[in-house]
A protein has these predicted regions:
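Conserved beta-strand termini and adjacent loop/short-helix elements that scaffold enzyme active sites
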Residues: 40-42, 103, 131
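Conserved N-terminal catalytic core of the sugar/cofactor nucleotidyltransferase
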Residues: 1-72, 88
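Rossmann-like NAD(P)H-binding beta-loop-alpha module
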Residues: 56-60, 65, 69-70, 105-130, ...
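Catalytic-core segments of class I nucleotidyltransferases/pyrophosphorylases
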Residues: 123-168
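Acidic metal-phosphate-binding loop of nucleotide-sugar-dependent transferases
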Residues: 79-81
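Conserved donor-nucleotide/metal-binding helix-loop-beta segment in metal-dependent transferases, i.e.
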Residues: 83-116, 122
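His/Asp/Glu-rich metal-coordinating catalytic cores
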Residues: 67, 84-87, 137-144
Length: 168
């Protein structure tokens, strides 16, 4: 579990299968004294999917986010399958001094595969210049794994900024 002791799973809709799959979290070897698996639900059901976003779910659970006593958050989706040591990912982020670190995978078959994924445009220092859909027009691409790490304080401020800019 990459030494991660506190896991929050945000669920927008149809939670039964997620809850059944995760169970109590005991099989993830989470330290029962200092860690926990927390399932967080969206407080409102929006009939319009355009407003049923990760941001709205984070906003509905802002109190839990604000109470976290951890300096960093790792945000990862449920629909990407990959193997990574998140502890190493976090340490690499801290050592880099970057505000946000994105996880990506260099591929050489982006013309035929990963067509539903976003790809990153990187500069020479591997800084992100763009995030855009993979249109299948290049063989070599950096596929964004929809996973990032940043300070908790920055994450909360970005959520609040998104709320102010949005029509939610």
């Amino acid at each position: 579990n990459s030494n991660i002791e506190r896991i929050q799973v945000y669920i927008n809709n149809k939670p039964r299968s997620v809850v059944e799959h995760l169970g109590t979290g005991r099989h993830y070897n989470i330290n029962s004294k200092s860690g926990k698996l927390q399932l967080l639900f969206s407080e409102h059901n929006n009939d319009n999917d355009i407003y049923n976003t990760d941001i709205s779910c984070y906003l509905d659970n802002m109190e839990s986010l604000s109470r976290m006593n951890h300096p960093y958050v790792v945000i990862a989706p449920s629909y990407m399958v990959y193997s990574i040591d998140f502890d190493q990912f976090l340490h690499t982020h801290i050592e880099s001094g970057a505000d946000v670190t994105l996880l990506y995978h260099a591929v050489d078959n982006a013309k035929e595969a990963y067509l539903t994924c976003n790809v990153l445009g990187l500069n020479r220092q591997k800084g992100v210049e763009s995030i855009e859909p993979n249109h299948g027009n290049k063989k070599n691409q950096y596929v964004y794994m929809d996973t990032c790490v940043m300070k908790t304080e920055l994450f909360i401020s970005l959520i609040k900024e998104a709320k102010n800019l949005s029509s939610m």
